[in-house]
Amino acid sequence: MNAAISATARYLPEGVLSNLDLERMLDTNDEWIRSRTGISERRILRDPKKATSYMCGEVASQLLRKRGLAAEELELIIVATMTPDMMFPSTACLVQDIIGAKNAWAFDINAACSGFLYALNTASQFIKAGTHKNVMVIGGDKMSSIIDYTDRSTAILFGDGAGGVILEAAESEGFGVLDARMYSDGTNGKDHLLMKGGGSLHPATHDTVDQHLHYIYQDGRMVFKSAVTSMADVAAEIMERNGLTSDDVSWLVPHQANQRIISATAERMGIDESKVISNVGRYGNTTAGTIPICLSELDDGGHLEHGSNLVLVSFGAGYTWGGVYVKWQ
């Protein structure tokens, strides 16, 4: 039996970093930011004692309440993140502790902005195989912890947030996660979107800190071109493999990198913007959090009906990208 989404949830911190705030910090302005990214503000987790696990823990608690599950009923927790609280233990283990899911095993997946789709695809296999009944999948990042707020090319893009889902066996055939295609390209991707510092190649030293190696670096032009092409191509592949036309697609749920990428992807797919969810203007790019946050907003807003066809697409560092076809039950 296919895996189906039985609950959704999201967490966005209360702190807001607006374009006007960035005007006071950087050589930029609101009009320039909005025209190039579509972003007006982003959420920031300002409490230095709280990190990615806190946001993911909030999502996990909501998911349990919404689905009416006890924490002990969870069998697996997968967290997609590129900003773990620490190198180890995994953020998923920290979330397990936060909610008291003592019977679940837990691990992280790091595929940057594609992380949630990688995790969703991975988790669905355990349901489909019949070895697990209740699996929690969360995507979240505290991007403000790795942003250089003197670099306007990246500081304007990213925000903090998390979202997640619970997966269970679909109630009937033909619903749930019906197809997925995942890709990676380390050859062309490794130099254009990365954080050099903090790993075994460049462990923390005075030099790595002075050189700003512990902040995200992005070649915006290269990433833009690759993101649009890759997301549109994998979406087209998903649609072709499953006999879907643009009219059949109820919602395109794209990674919220920036509005230009979202619009260009939808245009290449021939999907009307009225069927494309976009919240990047309010939250910025929350990396692994974008797609589950979108799903939660659609769900809470009553926009997902029985039989709705969702095409989820993402692109991230690596390069990594992928698409998932979900028929809502």
From Swiss-Prot:
Residues 256-260 are annotated as: ACP-binding. The active site is at 113, 255, 285. One of its GO terms (biological process) is fatty acid biosynthetic process. It is found in: Cytoplasm. One of its GO terms (molecular function) is 3-oxoacyl-[acyl-carrier-protein] synthase activity. Its EC number is 2.3.1.180. One of its GO terms (cellular component) is cytoplasm. CDD domains: KAS_III. Keywords: Acyltransferase, Cytoplasm, Fatty acid biosynthesis, Fatty acid metabolism, Lipid biosynthesis, Lipid metabolism, Multifunctional enzyme, Transferase. InterPro entries: ACP_syn_III_C (IPR013747), ACP_syn_III_N (IPR013751), FabH (IPR004655), Thiolase-like (IPR016039). Its main location: cytoplasm. It catalyses: malonyl-[ACP] + acetyl-CoA + H(+) = 3-oxobutanoyl-[ACP] + CO2 + CoA. It is an enzyme of class 2 (transferase). Pathway: Lipid metabolism; fatty acid biosynthesis. The last Arg residue of the ACP-binding site is essential for the weak association between ACP/AcpP and FabH. Homodimer. This is Beta-ketoacyl-[acyl-carrier-protein] synthase III. It comes from Chlorobium luteolum (strain DSM 273 / BCRC 81028 / 2530) (Pelodictyon luteolum).
